[in-house]
Amino acid sequence: VSAQKKTQKTYIPWSNGKLVVSEEGRYLKHENGTPFFWLGETGWLLPERLNRDEAEYYLEQCKRRGYNVIQVQTLNNVPSMNIYGQYSMTDGYNFKNINQKGVYGYWDHMDYIIRTAAKKGLYIGMVCIWGSPVSHGEMNVDQAKAYGKFLAERYKDEPNIIWFIGGDIRGDVKTAEWEALATSIKAIDKNHLMTFHPRGRTTSATWFNNAPWLDFNMFQSGHRRYGQRFGDGDYPIEENTEEDNWRFVERSMAMKPMKPVIDGEPIYDEIPHGLHDENELLWKDYDVRRYAYWSVFAGSFGHTYGHNSCLLYTSDA
């Protein structure tokens, strides 16, 4: 056993080349033709809530369990503060002096997470900034351009980045800001794929399928059970189809041009039906598997998992 461990090597997927979209637009592959099946893990607040040792441990567990993409929020707030008390912005959206000598800053910690993941063969799905602060006016178009330039210049040469524009938000909310962020990154970074993480029960294909910066579509099937409408007046799907995540695959792949599609946020394991009401029943592992089967068999190029104990890294989880 010890000899086997010594010879066992970490699989580095980008040794097959960068991720690209297949010619027919159905799935992702590497430059040498090796197919890539996305098996994502949701670790939204990893950059903020875990220290170096905890982050390394978490990423190692992800590797051992076969995940290959870890989805994180680069910024959850403006500014965000991490476990070391360091802020993501020390001078607004001016990042000129963000690196302070002798200080292990917010972005140093982000660098550490990305490079630790790379050593383990893991991609980081980077939600550049969550949707709520943008919807509240905390990033305008010029600021989005500055932030996108900063991100692209800092991470364009890292091998394991996948860019997420948006963050639990509709694409018709603050569209100009999202477009500015996406295009400013793509103008500098030619090495990494990009998508848009939308609001529950919507798909990025609705707004951005023709956008040249969007390499593949993402939908959020959401966390509601059949008939759990909550009285929403502006409901984006037919009632009593809430659990049918395969419908989003069909809807997305019917668009022209066809782009690969994935459920980037389905129901979370051990989360209440509808997400927030603790008196509700909890989604279980067999529910999670059903979502994965339905999505992948309908034609998605992978799937993302999430568990209540890992999403926000709360001490009492």
Cite the ranges covered by each PLM segment.
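Bacterial Sec-dependent N-terminal signal peptides
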Residues: 1-7
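Active-site mouth of glycoside hydrolases
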Residues: 11-228, 235-244
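Short, charged N-terminal helix-start/capping segments
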Residues: 39-50, 90, 295, 299-303, ...
